[in-house]
Each structure stands twice: as structure tokens, then as C-alpha cells.
Curated annotation (Swiss-Prot):
Keywords: ATP-binding, Cell cycle, Cytoplasm, Kinase, Nucleotide-binding, Serine/threonine-protein kinase, Transferase. GO terms for biological process: G1/S transition of mitotic cell cycle; G2/M transition of mitotic cell cycle; regulation of protein localization. It is found in: Cytoplasm. The gene is VHS1. Pfam families: Pkinase (PF00069). Signal peptide: none annotated. Residues 406-433 have a biased composition (Polar residues). This is Serine/threonine-protein kinase VHS1.
Amino acid sequence: MMMFHNCRINNYLITSQIGEGAYGLVYRALDIRTDRQYAIKAVVQSYGVSKEADMGNDKIHKNSVKLQKKLAKLFKESKNVVRVPSIDLESIENMSEEDFKKLPHYKEISLHLRVHHHKNIVTIHEVLQSAVCTFIVMDYYPTDLFTSIVDNRHFVTNGLLVKKVFLQICSALNYCHEHGIYHCDIKPENLLLDTEDNVFLCDFGLSTTSTYIKPNVCIGSSYYMPPERISFDGRVSSSKSGGHKLGKVCPSCNGDLWSLGIILINLTCIRNPWLKADKTEDNTYYYFTKDPNILKQILPLSDDFYSLLSKILQVNPKNRMSLQELMKEVSSITSFTNEGPLSKVPPLSKSVYEKFVSPVDNTNENLSPKSYVYMHDSKAAKNLSYTSSSEEEDGIKEGIDDDNGSRSGSFGTLDTDTGLHSSFTSTSCESDNECSKISNKFSLFEKKFNELRMSSSSLTN
């Protein structure tokens, strides 16, 4: 891994590399003007669209090294201070399908911008364009849900905390669906956490605006990918698991719902039920399609939780419960496991439920909806923490503070599959005048981008 010590991109000083994927690198950076931390994702300027996130580690590493070398050359030739233009975010947000044919790597950014106003979706602050890559400046958060579940055992002793985090994820995803965007890669690595255990959805690299997706089109990460996207022949093995012949397309939103079911198992049981929802490759999943009760044999599920999962993990996507129904049932459920701390979980009051699922932060009317931007700041975190009934608040904090970092209740372990990805989209204008403005903005942006590429072509060789 190449370290870019004392290297700057405009006013952002790179302090460390915190992630890598098939099409980009993620750095932690300090804004030297405000002394605030950000995450900067460096995305290669053009790549073939790969819909499956599970690219081999060797290929991911090879692509990362290639980009690192280009960045090293860029920093060297600019004496460690790269000055690049900031692209108008509104222009990117309103890019069309035709625009993406010219600049395919902007699809992910555009979709993300359309929903990043939700309080539980990572904010994009700037998009910077160089001849080597596009830099996306976003919120920085100290950890992700995978680390919190597996390494810190953070949720298995506190049912209220499970509800809080899961409902925030559902709220963010529901907001995306309402805006015609389907994430298609919901997994713990794409869910970040602040110091107050608020969760933030990120990485829209595989997202689509297509309401329906054809069966057997692999989009997502294997552990969380619904069966209809892996291997589907138009038949379902058992009527118990909701089986009947599917049509030629499957609802995109219901694929995200399946992923949420696996996430909820992760939060409560610290494991995945199977490695892949493919009858030919995974025996556990095969037996599940024959008899869904197998879940109660391999996981410590309460009857109520099993009943809920049976409505989510329907093999036929058209038979899955709605996201709104899922949110309501999670709010009212009184047990997740058949023993231990999660065997008794109080239902949420209406006010607390609404606070968790609200798309904006209503804890302080003087603060903007996205005041979560600086939640890594402990003072800001205290000012922005939610309020609830004393009993519920004490219940959440008790599970965080009382175990001094030592948490019990593990029933297995999750396997990691990380990566950065790529994407889809479309848009429309409400008037000819609006379309003209967007077209003019994009033309100027495209011209500037081409000038940058031509003047610095040696950097990409």
C-alpha cells in the first residue's frame, strides 16, 4: 500500500488509506481550513460495468495498485499539492442516461446525490475532477456495521439498539425507493456508524433506477444477494417458502428487502444463515427451500422473529412483505432470540419509532437536516443525540456501557466480502428551460473534463 504523506488535494490533506475496491480507493483526509475530517473516494474515470460486488481479491488489489501508481505520479508531478476543479453537484445530480454514456463513472455519484439529504445516508460535499480520477468528498465515520457486529459484538446484548440501527437502515432505504433508486448492495460494509450508533448508508455503485430486474442477473454481494439474482429457473421448490412460477422480471425493491432480512440476522445472531442463496451451491439454503423451519434449527430464533423472517425471506420475491410492514413489525416485536439478552425486547413507543425512521434530524430545529455531517466530533454528537422516554434511552445506553467492551452471545461469525463498485441511472427535466440549463452546465463540465484529460494525458500512461 502506497502512503501519500503530506499530499494534498486542494484543501484536503490525506492522512491515511481506509479502503480499496475494484474501481477505487478511499482515503481519510483533513480539511486544513476547518480542521474537520472527511472520506475521499478516488474513482477511476472509466470502467466496465460489473454488477457483482464479489470481485476476486487479486483483481481488486491489482486495480488498486494501478490507481495508486497513477496517483503517486500525479502527486509527484504536482509537488504533493494537486489543485483540481470542483464540479457543480446539481449538474451531476441531473445527468441523463446519455450523459453517462460519455462519463459512466458518474452514475454512482448522481444516484447518491439524489438521496443524500436523508439523515441516514452519507453526504457528498464535493466532487473534484483530475486527469487521473474523480475524487468524491464525503462524510467520514469511524467504523462500519461489519466491524461493530463481528469485532465489537456491539448489538447482541441490546435489543433496543438493534431496533434503532435497523430502523434507520430501513428508513434510508425506503427514502431511496420513494425516489426511484434501488441500492442492490445492502451489506454491513456499506453501512457506517458514528460515535452515537447512528447508521449511514453509502456506496451506490451498484444502484439502479430500474423498477424491475431480470432474473439471474447477479447484482450485489453473495451473502446478501436474493436468490432470484443468483440462479433462478422460473420455479420454486416449496409452496412453504412462497413458491410459484415467476414472470420475466423481479421487483428491484424486493431484492433490497431480502438483504435487509440477512442484515437483521447478522445484528441478532452474529452470523449468516448461508453463504449463498443458491440451491446448487449451498446445502443450508437448499434445505431452507424445502423446509423454512431449518432456520430455527441453525439459529437461536424466537417464534416471533422466525415468523417475521419467514415473511422477508420468501424465495418468490413477489411474496415478500413490504418495507413499511417490516418497519412496523420490527418496532413492535418483543423478542429476537429464544434465550439471552435479546429474548425480551420492549416495543417502541410511537414517538421513538417516528424519531428513528424520520428522514431528517428533528432533535434541534436550529440545525440543518444533515448536521450529522460532523458526528465524529464528540461535542456535536452529544448535541445531536436523539431524545426518548427515559426507560427506552436507558435501555439503549445500558447495552452500550455496561459490558466494558466484553460482549457475549455469539452464535457464529460473519465472513467479510468488501469492495467498491459501479452503477446505473436515468433522469428527466420538468421543463424545457430546466433541461436547457442542465445541458449547458453539463456541456461546460464536459469541456473542462476533456481539457484536463488532454493536458495531462501523460499521467495516465
